[in-house]
Design a protein with these regions (language model features):
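Alpha/beta-hydrolase-fold enzymes
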Residues: 223-338
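Short beta-strand/loop motif that positions the catalytic acidic residue
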Residues: 358, 364-366
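N-terminal cap/lid segment of alpha/beta-hydrolase-fold proteins
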Residues: 16-74
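Conserved alpha/beta-hydrolase "acid-adjacent" motif
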Residues: 371-382, 407
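Catalytic histidine-centered segment of alpha/beta-hydrolase-like enzymes
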Residues: 402-434
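Active-site nucleophile elbow and catalytic-triad environment of alpha/beta-hydrolase enzymes
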Residues: 334-354
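Alpha/beta-hydrolase active-site loop
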Residues: 139-214
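Short, surface-exposed "cap/lid" segments of acyl-processing enzymes
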Residues: 66-120, 126, 130-151, 156
Length: 472
């Protein structure tokens, strides 16, 4: 099964881009989805009911197009982008909303226009990938009311516990009671967390293999990019000591560079069961998000950070990837508001010891104003400091006026046009288009050359005007 959505070529051809009967630079981009089939390995998912089940992964590919064919001799580059906890790959990395300064907010489109083939999977339990009828498709698998203090349960449908506040209790009562439950909580068909980190490690390795086969990058290597929780998954996928899902050495041979963007950090190397146990339900639900509000005076200083309408476009994109969840929620029967379904899971595999064993050149990029409690800016510093001293290409980049939603953030006003410098990734006299533009430029440079602002190694700050300077 395959859908194709070609995009118009647009004004991407530059003088000298065409040579004879071939193109040196892309003349456009094309987007398409494809699916990767697999069988769930025994013992990988927390609930054994899913062992041996057939499943598939959705992969959203945005690739460069060369109208006359690509000229021979130049390198072919590809990247795999791994999403975070709440948003699937296509919704996270291909937001088609107007960006400040022109173009759109889509990271995948920007990289494709730079000649980079991009593949963004929806990991198991996300987007249009398999969620299982008796897994995340069952509204009865959302959380129930908590157990009593003495451990008893007085509710006939059952009770729940959770190990992480991002998986709240009684979402059947708070979000689903009207649509679709019709006024009555129901018992679970699965009573365990949906996944553990290694479930998605398996996914990532399959997608890396697929990217190498489809994109045919030079040297048979791709750049692996992890955003937010995706950083944890990427790190674990490259960890040679992983015994639950062996095969890191083969994946490492196919990865030339790594990026950790707004990454979570500081988890035990292996899975540790909490004293009260893990969550006893597989499904958690998210309502429509609002743009992050920074505390004053940062909010006043970061003019134009919130791009008008971008959050609405993102939500529409999320629901388009969730045909079941979009019919859930709300308090008026038959008039659902839509909910974003995501899995519960246990997290491990990303800490200073694991970072110290990484071998691919590594870019760490993070918003300096990230107020997500799980992903403070200090995470980026800790990751960078833990990377091997022998790593020849490694860069740390903090971006001012950027939060955890830096892929959607812009800039307006006088601050965006520095008087005595040029915006990183831009041209003299052209205003900064915000953190989203910095991320696009930084990733394109890293994927192509393993440098940031021309340097192979170092710490950098991109200031409130988009100017990059070395730090320390």
């Amino acid at each position: 099964m395959r859908t194709r959505r070609p995009r118009p070529a647009g004004p991407t051809r530059r003088p000298g881009a065409a040579t004879g009967r071939c193109d040196r630079a892309p003349t456009g981009v094309a987007a398409e989805d494809h699916w990767l089939d697999f069988t769930v390995p025994a013992g990988l998912m927390p609930d054994a009911r899913f062992d041996g089940r057939p499943a598939r992964l959705q992969v959203h590919r945005v690739r460069p197009v060369y109208a006359r064919g690509k000229c021979a001799g130049g390198p072919t580059r590809a990247a795999v982008l791994v999403h975070g906890r709440r948003v699937s790959g296509p919704a996270q990395f291909d937001v088609r909303h107007p960006a400040p300064g022109g173009g759109d907010l889509s990271l995948q489109t920007s990289l494709a226009r730079a000649g980079i083939d991009t593949l963004a999977p929806s990991l198991l339990g996300y987007g249009l990938s398999t969620r299982f009828q008796d897994g995340l498709d069952d509204p009865g698998n959302a959380s129930l009311r908590p157990y009593e203090a003495d451990g008893s349960c007085t509710h006939p449908e059952g009770c729940d516990r959770t190990h992480n506040p991002v998986f709240p209790l009684d979402q059947q009562g708070s979000l689903l009671l009207t649509n679709p439950l019709g006024g009555e909580r129901i018992a679970h068909s699965s009573s365990a967390r949906f996944a553990r980190t290694d479930v998605w490690v398996r996914d990532i390795r399959q997608v890396v293999d697929d990217a190498v086969a489809r994109a045919k990058p030079t040297g048979g290597k791709v750049t692996l990019i992890g955003y937010s929780l995706g950083g944890v998954h990427v790190a674990r996928a490259l960890y040679a000591g992983n015994t639950m899902v062996p095969g890191a050495a083969d994946t490492l041979r196919k990865v030339n560079r790594v990026v950790f963007m707004s990454s979570l950090f500081g988890f035990p190397t292996e899975e540790v069961t909490p004293p009260a146990g893990f969550a006893t339900f597989p499904l958690t639900l998210n309502t429509r998000p609002s743009p992050t509000r920074l505390p004053q005076p940062r909010d006043q200083a970061c003019t134009g950070r919130v791009v008008p309408g971008a959050a609405d476009t993102l939500w529409d994109r999320i629901l388009a990837q969730d045909p079941i969840g979009r019919d859930w929620g709300g308090t008026e029967p038959g008039n659902p508001t839509g909910l974003n379904r995501t899995p519960t899971f246990s997290t491990y595999g990303w800490n200073a010891d694991v970072a110290g064993r990484l071998t691919p050149p590594t870019l760490v990029i993070h918003g300096l104003d990230d107020i997500d409690p799980a992903a403070p800016p200090t995470n980026a510093t800790a990751i960078y400091d833990a990377l091997p001293a022998t790593m020849t290409n490694k860069a740390l980049v903090h971006v001012a006026c950027a939060t955890h939603e830096l892929l959607l953030e812009g800039c307006t006003g006088a601050r965006c046009l520095p008087q005595a410098a040029t915006v990183y990734g831009g041209r003299p006299g052209v205003p900064w288009a915000g953190p989203q533009a910095t991320v696009k430029a930084a990733l394109a440079e890293w994927i192509k050359s393993g440098t940031f602002n021309g340097a192979a190694t170092g710490r950098f700050l991109v200031d409130e005007s988009g100017v990059a300077e070395p730090v320390g």
